Amino acid sequence: WFYVEKSALNWDYTGLTNYYGTWYYVENSILNWNFTGLTDYYGTKYYVENGVLNWNYTGLALLGSDEWYYAENGAVKNDYTGLTYFCGRWFYVEKSALNWNYTGLTNYYGTWYYVENGELNWNFTGLTDYYGTKYYVENGVLNWDYTGLALLGSDEWYYAENGAVKNDY
């Protein structure tokens, strides 16, 4: 399969092309059945699987060799910020891009989770600071029922009530 433009092969073209309602990934004018990942087409990133645009795909997808984005229904959703599940792990996405630098809390369907370096950390138990308030996290989940002493870092103890440190103690 070759990409023809104005009755001639265009060896320089790499991108998507529509053929009878199906979108295919073409690389240097040749259909690339081995390509799986994201491609940019007129400013929108689309998910291609085995050379064909997959409109049913939702999840993380790779652009190039090191950029991960959140795609929904085959296209990158630029306004999404939150968690996404991929290959058995949960990752933090900010404005559709996986953010390896984020450490803090994030709300996902009403539950607050602790993210460390872009990945949900199920092993974390202790206090974390979120917008000036310290919250108690247990096994990666904010525990609103916790009341008692809690450790921040390696040597700072605070009293938490209902999952948050009260500054008036």
Please tell me what each predicted stretch does.
Residues 1-169:
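Extracellular adhesion/carbohydrate-binding repeat motifs centered on closely spaced tryptophans
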